[in-house]
Swiss-Prot record:
Annotated disulfide bonds: 24-34, 28-39, 33-42, 38-47
Protein name in the entry: Conotoxin Lt11.1
Keywords: Cleavage on pair of basic residues, Disulfide bond, Secreted, Signal, Toxin
Similarity comment: family membership: Belongs to the conotoxin I2 superfamily.
Tree of life domain: Eukaryota
Domain notes: The cysteine framework is XI (C-C-CC-CC-C-C).
Keyword Signal: yes
GO CC, any one term: extracellular region
Tissue: Expressed by the venom duct.
Compartmental location: Secreted
Lineage: Eukaryota, Metazoa, Spiralia, Lophotrochozoa, Mollusca
Signal sequence, start to end: 1-23
Propeptide: 53-63
Length: 63
């Protein structure tokens, strides 16, 4: 019983991660990212730092 419960929870967590990752990839393609976890995932600043995000993107493309 305990094993089944654990595996169900594990599957739920994994599914959430997949969904989140896909959503974050969509967020990453924008210049700024507005959802905190996605910002962390993408290494992007949140919406308050729009100008800095744009600069980082531009500098990143030049490398």
């Amino acid at each position: 019983m305990m094993f089944r419960l654990t595996s169900v929870l594990l599957v739920i967590v994994l599914l959430n991660l997949v969904v989140l990752t896909n959503a974050c990839h969509m967020d990453c393609s924008k210049m700024i990212c507005c959802s905190g976890i996605c910002c962390f995932y993408c290494g992007l600043p949140s919406c308050d730092d729009t100008r800095r995000a744009l600069l980082q993107r531009l500098l990143g493309h030049q490398r």
